[in-house]
Regions:
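Glycine/threonine-rich phosphate-binding loop and adjacent beta-strand/alpha-helix elements that clamp
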Residues: 2-27, 31-39, 44-50, 55, ...
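Active-site-proximal cap/loop segments of hydrolase catalytic domains
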Residues: 49-348, 352-355
Length: 597
C-alpha cells in the first residue's frame, strides 16, 4: 500500500486477462495560498500545486506558456508548461519531459529539488527544470523548446495516472503530434531525461509517433517487474512507494507496489510495462551507468531497439551528475542538432559504442573506449569453478564434493580467484550453482562480484564524484523463481520466467542460474575477483536510495560444489583487439581505394 493511502480497484482487460488494477489516492494538488491555510494534520494529504495559465519571460529571449491545455484522443486534458524562444519567426524543435514528478517542482520550495540531485554542483540546474529533465534555461537559448508535462492523473491533468504501459505511451504519442502542429514548432519533437523520463521514452517511441525525431534515454529500465518491483523474483516494493510518494493528482495512481503484492508472478499487467523494442526505429542515444539499477534496462533497450542509428555510452558515474555535466549536455545537443535540425555536424562519426573500463574508486582504466557492438564480439567466456573446500575458484571443476553455508540473516560466503595476468571483464557474468535450503522452502540470494587489491583489500568503485562506494556487478534470485524463460535467456544471460513458484522440498538440491548485470572492469595481475553470496543486500548504509527487499529467508543456505555439483562463475574475458600475430590489411568495404588513385 502506498503509504497507507486509500485504495480502490478497477477491473481492466489486459492481454486477454481480466486484471483487477489497484489504484491509490494521490496527494491533492492545492493552490499555495489555500495550502498555507490548512491545519497541519491536513497538509499531509495535500501538495502545494499552483494552477496559473499565463505567459511570462523566464530570461531575456525566453518565455514560458504556463498550464497549457492539451487534449488526448479520449478527451482527457493534460496540462503543460512550454518554455521556448520568444522569437516566433524562427521555428524550433521541442524536447519533451514526460514523468509524474510535477512540471514545476521548484515553485513552492526552490531548494527541495536540488536536495534530490546529489552529485550535481550547486548552480548547475535552474529553477525552470523539472526533476531529471532537460533544463529550459540551457536548451531554449540554444534554439529548442522544452515542455514540462503533467502527464495523465498528475497535478490538474485528468484521468487515472498509469505508470508506464500502453495508456501512458498513447498519451505520449498524442502529445508529440499536438506539439509538432504548433506554429512555433519546426515539426520535430524529441525526448530527454533520466530514470522515469527515460523509461517513458522506450514506451512512447514504440508507438511510433510520426513526428518523433529521435530519443535520448539517459538510464531507463526496460522491464518494471524484473528490474524494479521483483528483481530476481525478490519483492522490492518500498522503493517504488518512495519514488511515487510525492505524486499528486485528482483521481488516483496506478499502485505498482500493491499490484506486486496482488500479482507476484508475471502476467499481462507486468507485460504491459515492457516496451516492444522491435518497434523503436528512430535514432537513439542511450547511456548506461555500470553501477545503477537502470543498467540492465539501458543495455537491453539499446540491444533490442530496431533503430539503425543507435549509440551507447556506458560509464561509471550516477545518472544525475552524468546528465547535467556540461560536456555531456553539449554532446546531447550535437545529437539533437543532427536529427531535430538537420545540422550536419559530424555526429555520425561518434563511435556506436563507448565503454569506460572501471578500475577502482574513481579511477577508470579506459574512458569512452570505442567499440562496434555490445556484448563485444571478441569476448571469450570462461568458467571459474567454486570449491567449498578452500573457498577458492578454480579453472577446473573440483573432483571432491564439498558444501558451504551461512545463516541468511547475518552471514555470507566468498569464493576468490587471483588473476596471474591483467584481465579485463566486459559484458555479462552469470553464477551457476547448486543450492539447498535447510529448514525452509525458499532462498533469496544476493550475489556481488567484487575486486580485491594484491593485499586483499576490497576496492569498490565510487560514484557522485568519488563520494559513494559501490561494490561491483550484482545479481539477485529467489530460488523458487529459478525457472528460466527459454526465449529470453542466452548462454551468457539467464533470464527467469517468473511464471510459477517452485518451492524446495526438504533435502532438495537444485541448480540455479543467477543473472548478473553487465559490467566493465580491469583486474591487474595479482588482484582477486570475489563472488559473494548472501541472503541480504550488503552495501554502504549511506547509499542514496532506500533499496529494501522483502526477503523470504530462514534456516540455513547451503551451496554444493565439485563433482556432480559443478558450480561456476562465468566471466566475459576481453581479448586484445590485435594479437601479436596480427598483420594489418585494408578492409576494402570500409575503405575502398580512392578514385584519384
Amino acid at each position: 500500500m502506498l503509504f497507507g493511502r486509500e485504495q480502490f480497484t478497477v477491473p481492466a482487460e489486459m492481454g486477454g486477462e481480466v486484471i483487477d488494477k489497484v489504484y491509490a489516492k494521490e496527494l491533492i494538488p492545492t493552490p499555495i495560498e489555500e495550502y498555507e491555510k490548512l491545519p497541519e494534520d491536513e497538509k499531509k494529504l495535500h501538495k502545494p500545486y499552483p494552477f496559473d495559465q499565463r505567459t511570462y519571460e523566464v530570461m531575456p529571449g525566453v518565455i514560458c506558456e504556463q498550464d497549457v491545455a492539451v487534449p488526448m484522443r479520449d478527451g482527457v486534458v493534460l496540462y503543460a508548461d512550454i518554455f521556448r524562444p520568444a522569437d516566433d519567426t524562427v521555428k524550433v524543435p521541442a524536447i519533451l519531459a514526460w514523468s509524474n514528478y510535477g512540471k514545476r517542482p521548484n515553485e513552492y520550495r526552490p531548494d527541495e529539488l536540488k536536495a534530490y540531485t546529489p552529485g550535481v554542483p550547486a548552480g548547475s540546474i535552474s529553477n525552470s527544470a523539472k526533476f531529471e529533465a532537460a533544463d529550459p534555461e540551457f536548451w531554449c537559448p540554444n534554439g529548442y523548446a522544452v515542455i514540462n508535462v503533467d502527464i495523465r492523473g498528475i497535478g490538474y491533468s485528468g484521468g487515472y495516472h498509469e505508470q508506464f504501459g500502453k495508456q501512458d505511451a498513447e498519451d505520449g504519442y498524442d502529445f508529440i503530434e499536438w506539439t509538432a502542429a504548433q506554429p512555433w514548432c519546426n515539426g520535430r519533437v524529441t525526448m530527454a531525461g533520466s530514470s522515469a523520463l527515460a523509461i517513458s521514452q522506450w514506451h512512447i517511441a514504440a508507438e511510433q509517433p510520426p513526428h518523433l525525431a529521435c530519443i535520448a534515454p539517459w538510464e531507463g529500465m526496460s522491464d518494471m517487474y524484473r528490474e524494479s518491483l521483483s528483481e530476481g523474483g525478490i519483492p522490492c516494493i518500498k522503493f517504488t512507494n518512495f519514488a511515487t510518494a510525492g505524486a499528486c493528482g485528482l483521481e488516483g495512481i496506478d499502485d505498482m507496489g500493491a499490484m506486486a503484492e496482488k500479482y507476484p508472478l508475471m502476467n499481462a499487467y507486468w507485460e504491459d510495462k515492457i516496451p516492444d523494442f522491435s518497434k523503436i526505429t528512430v535514432p537513439a542515444y542511450v547511456t548506461a551507468g555500470w553501477n545503477h539499477f537502470h543498467l540492465r534496462g539501458s543495455v537491453i533497450g539499446w540491444r533490442k531497439i530496431a533503430s539503425k542509428q543507435k549509440w551507447l555510452r556506458a560509464h561509471r558515474e550516477f545518472e544525475w551528475p552524468d546528465f547535467y555535466e556540461r560536456h555531456n549536455m553539449e554532446e546531447l545537443k550535437a545529437f539533437f542538432d543532427r536529427y531535430c535540425k538537420d545540422i550536419r555536424n559530424g555526429w555520425e562519426s561518434t563511435p556506436r559504442v563507448r565503454i569506460s573500463v572501471q578500475d577502482r574508486f574513481d579511477d577508470d582504466f579506459r574512458v569512452d573506449r570505442p567499440e562496434d557492438e555490445f556484448p563485444l564480439a571478441r569476448t571469450r567466456y570462461e568458467k571459474l569453478y567454486l570449491d567449498a573446500s578452500d573457498m577458492r575458484m578454480k579453472r577446473e571443476n573440483p573432483e571432491q564434493a564439498v558444501e558451504a553455508g551461512y545463516d541468511p540473516a547475518t552471514g555470507e560466503i566468498d569464493f576468490d580467484y587471483t588473476f596471474t595476468e591483467d584481465t579485463e571483464l566486459t559484458g555479462y557474468m552469470k553464477l551457476h550453482a547448486w543450492a539447498e535450503a535447510r529448514g525452509h522452502d525458499d532462498m533469496d540470494l544476493f550475489v556481488t562480484v567484487k575486486k580485491l587489491s594484491r593485499t586483499g583489500v576490497e576496492q569498490p568503485v565510487t560514484l557522485f564524484h568519488g563520494t559513494a562506494p559501490h561494490p561491483g556487478a550484482w545479481g539477485k534470485l529467489r530460488v523458487s523463481h529459478r525457472e528460466l524463460d527459454p526465449e529470453l535467456s542466452t548462454d551468457f544471460e539467464p533470464v527467469q520466467a517468473h511464471r510459477r513458484e517452485l518451492k524446495l522440498a526438504p533435502g532438495e538440491i537444485v541448480p540455479i542460474d543467477v543473472e548478473i548485470n553487465p559490467t566493465s572492469r580491469i583486474w591487474h595481475a595479482g588482484e582477486t575477483i570475489r563472488v559473494q553470496i548472501a541472503g541480504r543486500y550488503i552495501r554502504d548504509p549511506h547509499w542514496i536510495e532506500p533499496l529494501m527487499w522483502e526477503t523470504d529467508n530462514a534456516g540455513k543456505h547451503v551451496f554444493h560444489t565439485g563433482a556432480d555439483h559443478a558450480s561456476f562463475l562465468q566471466i566475459p574475458v576481453i581479448l586484445p583487439k590485435y594479437d601479436d600475430d596480427y598483420v594489418f590489411e585494408v578492409d576494402e568495404e570500409k575503405h575502398p581505394t580512392h578514385p584519384i588513385f
